[in-house]
């Protein structure tokens, strides 16, 4: 009986949330996918950051920082540490990311945070595109939606605008669709 109890107590720490793996795209159009591992310690840091938020607006501010940190840690394990904001500053370096890479990877990172219960005021939505002259899709971004009654406001979480490891740009979806965002 005591041996069984000892074995159960020894296994107890392993019953918590384990390290997580996420595929991060790069090379333009998700040509390359790196398997990135986030430790319990790193995810605990992100959890504490997000749980410091007192409302949805504050959660978006913390989420911008969290996405930047997650990309920085991914850059320690892959070539994406070379990625620069926009497309023009990348040059021919390995690890460059276009908006398809960013929107796909950021949506995966947001999904990880949602699955762990770290997003209290937002839910993850599908990737959105904005178009040039209302015809040709020209830019894609990850999207979150505020958890509210009635018409829920949506926001883009756009890491494409910034260098690797910097806070993501979070804007109202409607403004982003009209071209809002840093000039890169």
Predicted regions and their residues:
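Bacterial N-terminal signal peptides that target proteins for export
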Residues: 1-6
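N-terminal signal peptide c-region/cleavage motif recognized by signal peptidases
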Residues: 13-15
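Short N-terminal segments immediately surrounding and downstream of signal-peptide cleavage
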Residues: 19-35
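Second-shell loop/turn segments in exported
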Residues: 32-33, 49-60, 85-100
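N-terminal, post-signal-peptide region of Sec/Tat-exported proteins
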Residues: 42-76
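Mid-length scaffold segments of soluble, non-membrane domains
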Residues: 67-122
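Hydrophobic/aromatic-rich core segments of domains that either
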Residues: 111-176
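Low-complexity, Gly/Ser/Thr/Pro-rich intrinsically disordered linker/tail segments
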Residues: 179-184
């Amino acid at each position: 009986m005591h041996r069984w109890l000892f074995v159960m107590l020894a296994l107890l720490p392993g019953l918590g949330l384990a390290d997580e793996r996420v595929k991060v795209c790069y090379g333009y159009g998700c040509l390359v996918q790196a398997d990135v591992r986030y430790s319990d310690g790193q995810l605990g840091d992100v959890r504490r950051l997000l749980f410091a938020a007192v409302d949805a607006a504050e959660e978006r501010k913390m989420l911008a920082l969290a996405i930047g940190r997650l990309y920085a840690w991914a850059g320690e394990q892959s070539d994406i540490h070379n990625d620069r904001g926009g497309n023009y500053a990348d040059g021919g370096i390995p690890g460059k990311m276009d908006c398809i890479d960013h929107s796909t990877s950021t949506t995966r990172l947001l999904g990880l945070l949602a699955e762990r219960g770290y997003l209290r005021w937002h839910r993850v939505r599908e990737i959105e595109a904005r178009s040039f002259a209302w015809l040709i899709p020209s830019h894609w971004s990850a999207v979150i939606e505020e958890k509210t009654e009635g018409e829920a406001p949506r926001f883009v979480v756009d890491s494409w605008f910034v260098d690797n490891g910097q806070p993501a740009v979070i804007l109202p979806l409607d403004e982003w669709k009209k071209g809002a965002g840093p000039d890169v």
